[in-house]
């Protein structure tokens, strides 16, 4: 897939239809974007905006993906462990009853680290 980091402001074919980016470059950019998010995310508990827990979950998922599928090495396991430890000291936790995660009266419970507000009447 082409990875575009700057806006395209012309009708030039090379800009409108860029070549495929190398897979390694795309994965590196994902890692850089996650590290940027870590630096800029503010602490808080509002689950409708990105929180440190949400970013650390993404960081752990990325690191485990790189380790398992891209031969990323032990550095990626350490990165995942670091992110999971950061989540472990937060208020996020697994609930004892799986069904309670989805209960209408239990929205945004302790297991939810990021949520979207689905307001069906909003236009």
Predicted regions located by residue number:
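Structured, solvent-exposed acidic/aromatic patches
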Residues: 1-123
